[in-house]
């Protein structure tokens, strides 16, 4: 979360009254994240998150907001977008697309145990199954096509060694994506950004997934790879903790067992997840946008993760 577009107390208060959410009592800009403008807002009726979308368009956003509605109706704990009197859940504020969702209970678990990882794995599998009948379609906007467009943009900022790594991995991922095995992988709506800070826990129990604004239609295995690369690693080295990874995968497979092809391609899709976030962090770091409270992530972290996945693939 970040603040690119400043919203005053009075502007937020009027917007929340329009949505029948009561009187604004407090508003606070959210410093984490790098994509959208986010404010935590408290009213006399509850606590909410106000988001102004800085890159996603009015045409793209219904996919994300209605996906959250769809998942919520199927028992997945996710933020619920607030509708206006006409039933619209996508709004406009200061000329930008905007949405308000309820704030989930609890806190992020930034030092997860195997038990936390198991909870995330089980809920991710439930999410994948719950989304199978979601009718809206939208590609993963940070997928292979974006990688091929963006690698040439960041190449001038890299060392020779980094260029070799990023070009080699891009070629490998293009090769994997063209294979018959990859095309046979189960797919549907995925979260695509389910990091430790996008999950809430309360008293050890998982209370919700949030920040669905990188979601899209892609392979479930890619979503799994992204989670393993964050929930189940040592953050300093990027090294995988197999105890946490095994707990995550065992819990996931109690709900949706992996196919034989998924088991084979898991190392490749873990590499894909590391590559995606290394590339996007390079892009954000070297080509930043103006924003209050913006804290770009260190690109080096996911470079280390990618190198670890290359050196020590995780096999089921």
UniProtKB/Swiss-Prot annotation:
Task: Please give the superkingdom of this protein's source.
Answer: Bacteria
Concerning Pfam families, the annotation shows: APH
What keywords tag this UniProt record? Amino-acid biosynthesis, ATP-binding, Kinase, Nucleotide-binding, Threonine biosynthesis, Transferase
What is the uppermost EC class here? transferase
Q: Which InterPro entries match?
A: Aminoglycoside_PTrfase, Homoserine_kinase_II, Kinase-like_dom_sf, Pseudomonas-type_ThrB
The EC number(s) attached to this protein equal 2.7.1.39
Q: Name one GO molecular function term.
A: ATP binding
Its family? Belongs to the pseudomonas-type ThrB family.
User: What is the protein's given name?
Assistant: Homoserine kinase
Organism encoding this protein? Polaromonas naphthalenivorans (strain CJ2)
Q: What is the lineage of its organism?
A: Bacteria, Pseudomonadati, Pseudomonadota, Betaproteobacteria, Burkholderiales
Q: Which gene encodes it?
A: thrB
